[in-house]
């Protein structure tokens, strides 16, 4: 598992983020405070406070480098 911080501060970013990760057959969780939601759920993402950075847990072993490259626009360095 790999954890990165991401920013999803607009509706367009949320839609494109979900479209990107649904291409992968791995589990992705978003953690904000005490809430953990499925990152592939648009409704779940909108239940979080999107004004703050969110932790993304990526449960993937094989394609981790590829996934991180695709998610680069959302990752906070």
Regions found by a protein language model. Give the residues of each.
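N-terminal intrinsically disordered, cationic/polar leader segments
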Residues: 4, 18-22, 29, 57, ...
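Short glycine-/aliphatic-rich beta-strand segments at the starts of folded cytosolic domains
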Residues: 1-7
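C-terminal structural segments of small proteins and small subunits
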Residues: 49-77
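Electropositive phosphate-/nucleotide-binding environments in soluble metabolic enzymes
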Residues: 8-11, 61
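Intrinsically disordered regulatory regions flanking bHLH/HLH domains
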Residues: 3, 13, 23, 63-66
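Amphipathic alpha-helical interaction surfaces in cytosolic regulatory modules
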Residues: 11-27, 35-50
């Amino acid at each position: 598992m790999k954890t990165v911080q991401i920013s999803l501060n607009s509706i367009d970013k949320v839609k494109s983020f979900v479209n990107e990760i649904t291409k992968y057959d791995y589990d992705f969780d978003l953690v904000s405070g005490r809430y953990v939601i499925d990152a592939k759920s648009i409704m779940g993402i909108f239940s979080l406070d999107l004004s703050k950075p969110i932790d993304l847990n990526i449960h993937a072993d094989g394609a981790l480098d590829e996934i991180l490259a695709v998610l680069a626009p959302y990752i906070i360095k």
